[in-house]
């Protein structure tokens, strides 16, 4: 299935939900993800923090080996793909070197223990495997969560409860120190909003 066919078919719909289910699908961001991830049929690809699995469902057109993991039971009850599984992405239940590639879209800013997240990501990736991390550009922590904070808590100052970290490529590089993940590139991307994209590769 091509991207244009997917759009025409209406395969992906984004109902209005609470914040935990609100980040459903962004075609522009998916285009960017495909460019850097370069998925191929048969590859085992892991979506880290997949929410309801809209990106998992879209990725199924490129490989039958995609799996999504999310810890939100509310999101999983409304999952749109059977490849979505419940789990903690800082304590994954997969064996070492289980995946060819991985990606995480607007999830890392919510994770309390990021060093453990990157260590687990490195563990389940095969040597030479890529991981794409997308996270918000913010002048201050919580900037891009203000609207969500108003919607969810009726209080813009609760944005810092939603975004636990203000991340930059330099910060991500520091968090991956001591793991087998090497920095490949980082850039700002415009895809219905400004965000960072970082590409990491497992050495070995």
Model-derived segments and spans:
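Short glycine-centered segments of the SAM/dcSAM-binding site in methyltransferase folds
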Residues: 44, 128-130
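S-adenosyl-L-methionine-dependent methyltransferase catalytic module, highlighting the catalytic core
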Residues: 54, 58, 112-120, 130-204
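Conserved N-terminal segment of class I S-adenosyl-L-methionine
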Residues: 1-91, 95, 101-105, 118, ...
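Active-site acidic short loop of glycosyltransferases
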Residues: 96-100, 113, 127
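Short catalytic micro-motifs in class I SAM-dependent methyltransferases
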Residues: 106-110
């Amino acid at each position: 299935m091509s991207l244009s066919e997917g759009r025409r078919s209406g395969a992906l719909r984004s109902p209005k939900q609470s914040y935990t289910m609100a980040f459903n699908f962004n075609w522009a961001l998916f285009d960017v993800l495909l460019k850097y991830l370069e998925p191929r049929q048969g590859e085992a690809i892991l979506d880290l923090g997949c929410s309801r699995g809209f990106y998992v469902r879209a990725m199924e057109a490129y490989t039958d080996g995609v799996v999504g993991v999310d810890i939100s039971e509310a999101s999983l009850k409304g999952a749109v793909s059977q490849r979505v599984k419940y789990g903690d992405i800082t304590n994954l239940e997969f064996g070492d070197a289980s995946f060819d590639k991985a990606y995480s879209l607007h999830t890392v800013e919510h994770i309390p223990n990021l060093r453990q997240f990157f260590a687990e990501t490195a563990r389940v990736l095969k040597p030479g495997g890529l991981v794409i991390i997308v996270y918000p550009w913010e002048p201050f922590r919580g900037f891009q969560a203000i609207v969500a904070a108003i919607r969810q808590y009726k209080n813009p100052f609760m944005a810092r409860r939603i975004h636990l970290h203000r991340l930059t490529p330099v910060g991500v590089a520091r968090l991956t120190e001591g793991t087998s993940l090497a920095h490949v590139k980082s850039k700002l991307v415009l895809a219905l909003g400004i965000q960072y994209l970082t590409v990491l590769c497992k050495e070995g």
